[in-house]
Amino acid sequence: MPANAHDVERIETLIAYASANAEAYREAANDAEGFRAAAPLAHRAQERQAVAAHLQAYLRAGPADESSGDLTLRAPVVAVRRAAAPTDAEVVEAAVRDEGELQAAFEAALDDRALSAPARETVLKAYVAVRTGTDQIRDLRRALRDGP
């Protein structure tokens, strides 16, 4: 098990954020009109679910049993704002806004001096995947805004 109750509380909060973000991305992918936006949004949903699973595995097994594989290769509180028939650009814009909240939660955990070293390593690995996904969604937003 993790080193202390503080680690568990912090990681459970991140699991909730990542799970909610995954669900928001699934909904956004369903709302998207074209493959150009739907596919990357669905991929982000899978990645966010992988982040949540990574953190859950840490809580179940503890740091000694955690695999050291690259989290991004294991691709399997946030809400997409719904509107009537949103455009792909609007759907992606909502996802980008939600990314900021998720990223801030991970950054707060990494800044937490009370977090144990094994928990911090687990959170950092998940944060790298979150940050990469954030950058890719922002790139998609720019591409949709700037046109084909």
Question: PLM features: residue spans?
Answer:
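Alpha-helical bundle segments that constitute or directly flank the non-heme di-iron/ferroxidase center
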Residues: 2-32, 90-114
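Charged/polar positions within long, soluble alpha-helices
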Residues: 23-30, 53-60, 85, 104-111, ...
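Membrane-interacting alpha-helical segments
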Residues: 1-8, 75-88, 140-148
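Sparse recognition of residues in long alpha-helices and their boundaries
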Residues: 27, 34, 57, 63-64, ...
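Conserved alpha-helical segments that form or flank metal/cofactor-binding pockets of metalloenzymes
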Residues: 39-73, 136-144
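Preference for long, well-ordered alpha-helical segments
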Residues: 98-148
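Carboxylate-rich helix-loop segments that flank metal/cofactor sites and access channels
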Residues: 57-103
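Alpha-helical scaffold segments that form or flank carboxylate-/histidine-based iron centers
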Residues: 6-14, 33-54, 88-92, 117-132
